[in-house]
């Protein structure tokens, strides 16, 4: 018969075993309270240890992140709709910074900045994730830009060349063809081992759907990632979009691969940042933008570069798009971006109305880095082409005031008009290097002099077909990066002349 003390001792031992069998780790979670909600932002009380850019979970699983750290409250940017977030609801720290999925499984997908699929495809939760915000590569890890990025557009590749790792700005008034140039460049990367990322910021959903359909129709979606911060998305998601897209591109760059990213457009990005900053009572500056708007864009674009081999050896080429108003390129955001980037391509509404497509104003466009990467075949014609075209544009302005022109001036005007016609190009039809060189040699060597403008597109195609079929060795030489001598240029000009006579 057991005594009372033995029973008590047995119970104590069983209690000790039960306590030891339970997990001993306790989790401490900081819980805050929403004080105020406005469109895109919330003010939260009760998170004393929260950090900048830390992810916060609101009621219903909605996400946001810490943006302002004030002494008595936290200003949060919402990544989901604020309709279901009310004052008094709970907010929980996630102890992680904003991140986004990365990897090859993203190719061909349409996602939002935090990696949620928008195309109805499978979830991407199993992919590795990397922070959206990170420092740009240091100077000693950067290599010179030496390899060209072919756009497939004659006017760009010949006179405003782009290199892999360059930041080339596309700017112009709305509806002048900025996105069209970017999409043509993406299409032209098919088969060139370049991964493309199209980042839509504040654009209409119908316009983005049209872009995706065009990429799919031209077999360019398989090597492209589409990141969308639509116009009906919260401003915080629009602000985050380019940083998340850049993180996706940096992942491939560190693997030694070449990436091209299009930001369409950073004007909407700046407006989203202005919206958030004004709601969170950050001091406004010029045009009501916060004083750090330059830093916001520079820290984004400085992440695009060409890495040395020890750092990965890949490249990230940026094509940011900016929308100007009434051709005012000296406004605040355009001048900021011009000073940050390595060159700009300006699209003129005047040329657009004249039917000159792409409507690139060569005189106001420049590539400060790409000229060193241009393939030697272009250099045979690019210098004469730019000089002749610049003289033509200057003479054309003065010729309006005079009806009596000498023969040399008339010849320069006629040649300039031919060059302008030959630089026109239909959208979604990027040209190969031999096709471009054939057209440019034909126009600079006078082969097309006297050809009626209405017959020029047909004759140009005939010249391109003739050169690519009759001069295979020269085409291979151009593709390999070798220079053409005068005899070879003359050979191409003779083939072009034969094609012109055949269609006379």
Curated annotation (Swiss-Prot):
Keyword flag Coiled coil: no
Transmembrane residue ranges: none
Location(s), subcellular: Cell inner membrane
Domain of life: Bacteria
Keyword Amino-acid biosynthesis: no
Entry's Gene Ontology cellular component terms: plasma membrane; proton-transporting ATP synthase complex
Keywords annotated in UniProt: ATP synthesis, ATP-binding, Cell inner membrane, Cell membrane, CF(1), Hydrogen ion transport, Ion transport, Membrane, Nucleotide-binding, Translocase, Transport
Record's bilayer topology term: Peripheral membrane protein
Predominant cellular place of this UniProt entry's protein: membrane
Catalysed reactions, as listed in the record: ATP + H2O + 4 H(+)(in) = ADP + phosphate + 5 H(+)(out)
Site (Required for activity): 365
InterPro entries, per the entry: Alt_ATP_synth_F1_asu, ATP_synth_asu-like_sf, ATP_synth_asu_C, ATP_synth_asu_C_sf, ATP_synth_F1_a_nt-bd_dom, ATP_synth_F1_asu, ATPase_a/bsu_AS, ATPase_F1/V1/A1_a/bsu_N
A UniProt-annotated Pfam family: ATP-synt_ab_C
Enzyme class: translocase
Any one Gene Ontology molecular-function term assigned to this protein's record: proton-transporting ATP synthase activity, rotational mechanism
Family: Belongs to the ATPase alpha/beta chains family.
Protein function: Produces ATP from ADP in the presence of a proton gradient across the membrane. The alpha chain is a regulatory subunit.
Assembly description: F-type ATPases have 2 components, CF(1) - the catalytic core - and CF(0) - the membrane proton channel. CF(1) has five subunits: alpha(3), beta(3), gamma(1), delta(1), epsilon(1). CF(0) has three main subunits: a(1), b(2) and c(9-12). The alpha and beta chains form an alternating ring which encloses part of the gamma chain. CF(1) is attached to CF(0) by a central stalk formed by the gamma and epsilon chains, while a peripheral stalk is formed by the delta and b chains.
Protein known as: ATP synthase subunit alpha 1
Annotated source species: Rhodopirellula baltica (strain DSM 10527 / NCIMB 13988 / SH1)
């Amino acid at each position: 018969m057991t005594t009372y003390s033995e029973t008590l001792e047995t119970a104590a031992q069983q209690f000790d075993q039960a306590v030891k069998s339970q997990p001993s780790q306790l989790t401490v979670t900081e819980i805050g309270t929403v004080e105020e909600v406005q469109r895109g932002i919330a003010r939260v009380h009760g998170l004393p240890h929260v950090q900048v850019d830390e992810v916060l979970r609101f009621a219903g699983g909605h996400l946001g992140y810490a943006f302002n750290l004030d002494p008595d409250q936290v200003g949060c940017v919402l990544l989901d709709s604020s309709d279901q977030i009310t004052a008094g609801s709970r907010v929980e720290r996630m102890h992680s910074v904003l991140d986004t999925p990365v990897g090859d499984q993203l190719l061909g997908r349409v996602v939002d900045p935090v990696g949620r699929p928008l195309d109805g495809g499978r979830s991407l939760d199993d992919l590795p994730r990397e922070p959206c915000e990170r420092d740009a590569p240091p100077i000693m890890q950067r290599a010179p830009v030496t390899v060209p990025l072919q756009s497939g557009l004659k006017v760009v590749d010949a006179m405003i060349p782009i290199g892999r790792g360059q930041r080339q700005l596309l700017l112009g008034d709305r509806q002048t063809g900025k996105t069209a140039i970017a999409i043509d460049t993406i299409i032209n990367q098919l088969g060139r081992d370049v991964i493309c990322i199209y980042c839509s910021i504040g654009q209409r959903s119908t316009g983005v759907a049209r872009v995706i359909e065009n990429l799919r129709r031209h077999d360019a979606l398989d090597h492209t990632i589409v990141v969308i911060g639509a116009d009906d998305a919260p401003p915080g998601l629009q602000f985050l979009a380019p940083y998340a897209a850049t993180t996706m591109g940096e992942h491939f760059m560190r693997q030694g691969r070449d990436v091209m990213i299009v930001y369409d457009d950073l004007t909407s990005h700046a407006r989203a940042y202005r919206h958030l900053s004004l709601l969170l009572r950050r001091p406004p500056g010029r045009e009501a933008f916060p004083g750090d708007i330059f830093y916001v864009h520079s820290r984004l674009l400085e992440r695009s570069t060409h890495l040395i081999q020890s750092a990965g050896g890949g490249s990230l080429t940026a094509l940011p798009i900016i929308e100007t108003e009434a051709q005012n390129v000296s406004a605040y955001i355009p001048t900021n971006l011009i000073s940050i980037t390595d060159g700009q391509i300006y699209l003129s509404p005047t040329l657009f109305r004249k039917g000159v497509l792409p409507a690139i104003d060569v005189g106001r466009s420049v590539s400060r880095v790409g000229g060193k990467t241009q393939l030697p075949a272009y250099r045979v014609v690019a210098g004469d082409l730019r000089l002749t075209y610049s003289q033509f544009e200057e003479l054309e302005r003065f010729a309006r005031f005079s009806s009596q022109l000498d023969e040399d001036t008339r010849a320069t005007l006629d040649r300039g008009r031919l060059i302008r016609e030959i630089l026109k190009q239909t959208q979604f039809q990027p040209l190969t290097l031999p096709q471009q060189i054939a057209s440019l040699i034909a126009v600079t060597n006078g082969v097309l002099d006297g050809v009626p403008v209405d017959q020029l597109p047909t004759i140009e195609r005939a010249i391109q077909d003739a050169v690519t079929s009759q001069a295979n060795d020269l085409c291979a030489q151009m593709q390999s990066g070798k220079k053409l001598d005068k005899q070879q240029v003359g050979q191409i000009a003779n083939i072009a002349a034969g094609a012109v006579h055949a269609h006379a």
